[in-house]
């Protein structure tokens, strides 16, 4: 799980943050190691000994995702991963999440950035106060301008 507010341990180093998330997957497999997440996120690899409190918002988001991957999940839950990030960082994040999906990792995304969500999602579900008000594809959603306006403001 990657929470909305990029919860990282600010007094720990990048490497120590990763170690706090390390565990085998449900099937006992260890797919994600520090070396593999550093390959995925070279930006934080260069700062492996820096305390997380010195990282930028984008670097903290990368660290939060990397730490979640260290738990070797079969599903990665992401709550508003693009919130508060610069467009160039959102672009990089989208590329990384797309690569993870192509590797076969299931992503469950709560995201208001329609462009990022469209890039990553096979299916769309819109909830209102816990009730499903729409389920379908982005193409289906595009044919429903009233839903786009009401829930996405477009």
Protein language model regions, located:
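Helical segment within the ABC ATPase nucleotide-binding domain
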Residues: 91-103
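Conserved catalytic motifs of ABC-family nucleotide-binding domains
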Residues: 72
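ABC ATPase C-loop
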Residues: 68-69
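Conserved ABC ATPase signature
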Residues: 51-55
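H-loop/switch region of ABC-family ATPase nucleotide-binding domains
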Residues: 109-112
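ABC-type ATPase nucleotide-binding domains, specifically the catalytic core motifs of the NBD
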Residues: 14-32, 40-45, 49, 152-154
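Catalytic Walker B motif of ABC-type/P-loop ATPase nucleotide-binding domains
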Residues: 76-80
């Amino acid at each position: 799980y990657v929470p909305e507010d990029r919860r990282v341990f600010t007094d720990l180093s990048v490497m120590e943050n990763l170690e706090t998330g390390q565990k085998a997957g449900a099937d006992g497999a260890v797919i994600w190691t520090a070396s593999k997440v550093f390959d995925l996120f070279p930006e934080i690899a260069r700062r492996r000994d820096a305390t997380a409190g010195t990282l930028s918002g984008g670097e903290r988001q990368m660290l939060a995702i990397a730490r979640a991957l260290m738990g070797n999940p079969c599903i990665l839950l992401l709550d508003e991963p693009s919130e508060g990030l610069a467009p160039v960082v959102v672009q990089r994040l989208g590329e990384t999440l797309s690569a993870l999906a192509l590797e076969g990792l299931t992503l469950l995304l709560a995201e208001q950035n329609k462009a990022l969500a469209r890039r990553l999602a096979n299916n769309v579900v819109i909830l209102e106060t816990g009730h499903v008000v729409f389920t379908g594809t982005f193409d289906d959603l595009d044919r429903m301008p009233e839903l786009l306006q009401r829930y996405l403001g477009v």
